[in-house]
């Protein structure tokens, strides 16, 4: 197995990592670090913080976000299939129907469990 052909790829990856990491390290090493009470104090729109910034966040927002990502990815997988519909034939069509059936069953399950109700 000849690995010489992968040397440019390895070099490209190393240069890319170096371009990202070297400026960060230089800024950390060469940058001034003089903390004082004004810099370490919490700042909120020009005023001192009124209360603790950590507040409870409703879990339903996370659930909606996860469901959005799930069904958004479904659409992202359907676009390439729609473009190559003529080439994939009946086998590709059946595969996408199975994919959509699984997602519809999952959506119906979420609906039945009440995950989409905001009450």
Swiss-Prot record:
It is a multi-pass membrane protein. Signal peptide: none annotated. Its main location: membrane. The chain crosses the membrane at residues 9-29, 63-83, 88-108. Its EC number is 7.1.1.-. It is an enzyme of class 7 (translocase). GO terms for molecular function: NADH dehydrogenase (ubiquinone) activity; NADH:ubiquinone reductase (non-electrogenic) activity; quinone binding. It catalyses: a quinone + NADH + 5 H(+)(in) = a quinol + NAD(+) + 4 H(+)(out). InterPro entries: NAD(P)H_OxRDtase_bac/plastid, NADH_UbQ/plastoQ_OxRdtase_su3, NDAH_ubi_oxred_su3_sf. GO terms for cellular component: NADH dehydrogenase complex; plasma membrane. Keywords: Cell inner membrane, Cell membrane, Membrane, NAD, Quinone, Translocase, Transmembrane, Transmembrane helix, Transport, Ubiquinone. It is found in: Cell inner membrane. NDH-1 is composed of 14 different subunits. Subunits NuoA, H, J, K, L, M, N constitute the membrane sector of the complex. Belongs to the complex I subunit 3 family. NDH-1 shuttles electrons from NADH, via FMN and iron-sulfur (Fe-S) centers, to quinones in the respiratory chain. The immediate electron acceptor for the enzyme in this species is believed to be ubiquinone. Couples the redox reaction to proton translocation (for every two electrons transferred, four hydrogen ions are translocated across the cytoplasmic membrane), and thus conserves the redox energy in a proton gradient. This is NADH-quinone oxidoreductase subunit A. It comes from Acidovorax sp. (strain JS42). The gene is nuoA.
């Amino acid at each position: 197995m000849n690995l010489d052909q992968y040397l440019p790829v390895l070099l490209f990856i190393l240069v890319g990592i170096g371009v990202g990491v070297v400026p960060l390290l230089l800024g950390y090493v060469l940058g001034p670090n003089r903390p004082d009470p004004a810099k370490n104090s919490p700042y909120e729109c020009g005023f001192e913080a009124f209360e603790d910034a950590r507040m409870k966040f409703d879990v339903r927002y996370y659930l909606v976000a996860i469901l959005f990502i799930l069904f958004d990815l479904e659409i992202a997988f359907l676009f390439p299939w729609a473009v190559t519909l003529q080439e994939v034939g009946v086998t590709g069509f059946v595969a996408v129907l199975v994919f959509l059936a699984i997602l519809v069953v999952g959506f119906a399950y979420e609906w039945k469990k009440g995950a989409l109700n905001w009450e």
